[in-house]
From Swiss-Prot:
It comes from Conus australis. The cysteine framework is I (CC-C-C). Alpha5/5 pattern. Disulfide bonds join C2-C9, C2-C15, C3-C9, C3-C15. Neither AusIA-globular nor AusIA-ribbon shows effect on muscle nAChRs alpha-1-beta-1-epsilon-delta/CHRNA1-CHRNB1-CHRNE-CHRND (adult subtype) and alpha-1-beta-1-gamma-delta/CHRNA1-CHRNB1-CHRNG-CHRND (fetal subtype) and on neuronal nAChRs alpha-3-beta-4/CHRNA3-CHRNB4, alpha-4-beta-4/CHRNA4-CHRNB4 and alpha-4-beta-2/CHRNA4-CHRNB2. The lineage of its organism: Eukaryota, Metazoa, Spiralia, Lophotrochozoa, Mollusca. Keywords: Acetylcholine receptor inhibiting toxin, Disulfide bond, Ion channel impairing toxin, Neurotoxin, Postsynaptic neurotoxin, Secreted, Toxin. One of its GO terms (cellular component) is extracellular region. This is Alpha-conotoxin AusIA.
């Protein structure tokens, strides 16, 4: 799973 709309989470779960 990724965090498309959460900048704080994107570095952990980037959407590729």
């Amino acid at each position: 799973s990724c965090c498309a709309r959460n900048p704080a989470c994107r570095h952990n779960h980037p959407c590729v």
